[in-house]
Regions:
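Boundary at the C-terminal end of the N-terminal hydrophobic targeting segment
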Residues: 21-23
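Alpha/propeptide regions of enzymes that mature by internal proteolysis
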Residues: 38-40, 425-447
Length: 484
């Protein structure tokens, strides 16, 4: 089948206005890929108000607009999602890329994208095409690329749908707590752990399987690959290609020491003292009779910001709010019918499995008394200013193998609920964006798997509501609080 791309004028980033007074600044851009003209108005807060006549054009324009505003952020996101950060930062990012590829979603993409919306394939594909349209436009004049590209001596690369559905950015689970609890049981015993740590439910199974070797559990960096790909990216002076723009090593160390000290201070705090908040009040209790909603989801401060505001107007869509710029739709916001917000609802969506491996073949693990072959994928990581690195990605029936203790013939794998279909954080907000009632909002929330969330709702009919959403494994014979 041959698809003919029509060319239309799109009024992009035009009609800048402030305090409802329109200026005369208008820019017209002609793009391949639009069905009809699209108009984007930039207000004095920098929010893009996108008006399109088709759904395809709406999300094409959202991708184009967000990439134009946050191009460097988009490139770093793409590199994180695809496991290609080492091409930018060199050898120190190899383990990050290894971990990213190990936890890459490798399931059915059509089913995956349509989980988030009945027309998810079309929406996500349109968004990606819009992102790439701006990248192509920017590459026509590389000298005009934002300064960070010049400092790092890189250029933006095209996106694919796999970048949008990446899991790398989400608040995913509690595998570190599970491992630390298992180590504590090894070190001081179950009874002492129960005495020192609060559990809910209050009496979980903490008995370790006899197969688990406490020396191995205590003395190995089992989650190194997992943690490597989850860490935020931090640049160093020698990442800067132009030496005259580098910080001195002394200045860099001063900044790094401050960040390290802040992280240590944060780690001293109880996890119960850290978190987001939201609340919603019935109109019966407000002065004007309308429901009142407050939502304050806490995330790490970063530059550029994790949040990005948009207003999307098209057939079946009229929604404004915030989200992550690299994701189509609006994660937190309101339409003509209601408003919604979210905070994290703690669910245990990860389990650490320990296997006996075959001393004669480390790629075999024992399951139900039989040796099973791990699935092995070989990949090559390209590295800036160094030779490429070949890695083996291993998988058991339960998930990615994160550590192999060949001396003790053991392998550790993580079973993450978020690697199943529907595990991309916040993308299911696409369904919420079109909800017209509390009932429709609850139905849409059923598709929001990761992270677990407290969803709140308030609508023009005066309804308010709270719904916990998320998925967690059904554990029939273990608690998930310690490795199994």
């Amino acid at each position: 089948m041959v698809t003919f791309l029509k060319r239309f004028n799109a009024l992009l980033f035009g009609l800048l206005f402030s305090n409802c007074v329109f200026s005369q600044e208008t820019t017209q851009v002609t793009l391949d890929g639009l069905d009809k003209p699209v108009e984007i108005l930039k207000d004095h807060w920098g929010i893009s108000h996108i008006y399109a006549e088709t759904e395809h054009d709406l999300f094409f324009a959202q991708g184009y607009s967000a990439a134009r505003d946050r191009l460097f952020q988009f490139e770093i996101w793409r590199a994180q999602a695809t496991g290609t950060v080492a091409e930018i930062l060199g050898s120190r990012a190899v383990d990050r890329d290894h971990g990213t590829r190990l936890f890459k979603f490798r399931g059915p993409m059509h089913e995956e994208m349509n989980h988030y919306h009945p027309r998810g394939v079309d929406i996500i594909t349109s968004f990606v095409h819009g992102v790439n349209a701006y990248i192509d436009e920017a590459l026509q004049d590389p000298d005009s690329l934002p300064l960070p590209f010049k400092l790092l001596d890189i250029q933006p690369k095209h996106w694919t749908e796999e970048v949008v559905i990446s899991r790398h950015q989400g608040l995913l689970g509690n595998i570190s707590l599970e491992l630390s609890t298992g180590r504590a049981v090894c070190a001081i015993g179950e009874d002492k752990v129960r005495e020192l740590r609060y559990f809910h439910p209050h009496d979980p199974i903490l008995t370790l399987d006899p197969l688990i070797d406490c020396d191995s559990l205590l003395n190995n960096d089992i989650l190194h690959l997992y943690n490597s790909y989850r860490r935020p990216i931090r640049f160093q002076p020698d990442d800067i290609a132009l030496a005259q723009y580098r910080n001195t090593e002394e200045a860099y160390e001063t900044i790094a020491d401050i960040l390290i000290e802040e992280e240590r201070d944060l780690q001293k705090r109880s996890i119960d003292d850290i978190g987001s908040n939201n609340w919603v009040v019935s109109g019966d209790l407000t002065q004007d009779g309308w429901p009142m909603m407050i939502n304050d989801p806490h995330r790490s401060q970063a530059v550029p910001s994790l949040r990005y505001w948009s207003h999307l107007v098209g057939p079946g869509w009229n929604v404004i709010g915030g989200g992550e710029p690299e994701i189509p739709g609006i994660s937190i916001g309101h339409n003509e019918h209601g408003a919604w917000g979210l905070t994290v609802f703690n669910t245990d969506g990860e389990d650490l499995y320990v296997y006996e491996t075959n001393p004669n073949n480390p790629s075999q693990y024992r399951y139900l008394g039989e040796w099973e072959e791990m699935r092995v994928i070989s990949e090559t990581i390209e590295v800036k200013d160094a030779r490429s690195v070949s890695v083996e990605l291993k998988y058991t029936r339960h998930g990615p193998v994160v550590f192999e203790d060949q001396e003790n013939s053991l392998a550790y794998a993580i079973r993450p609920a978020w690697m199943e279909v529907g595990g991309s954080p916040y993308l299911a907000s696409l369904r919420m964006d079109q909800a017209t009632s509390w009932e429709e909002f609850r139905e849409a929330s059923n598709f929001s798997n990761i992270p677990g969330e407290n969803m709140i709702w308030a609508d023009r009919q005066g309804n308010i509501g709270w719904q916990a959403v998320g998925i967690a494994p059904i554990r029939r014979n273990f608690s998930g609080m310690v490795p199994v």
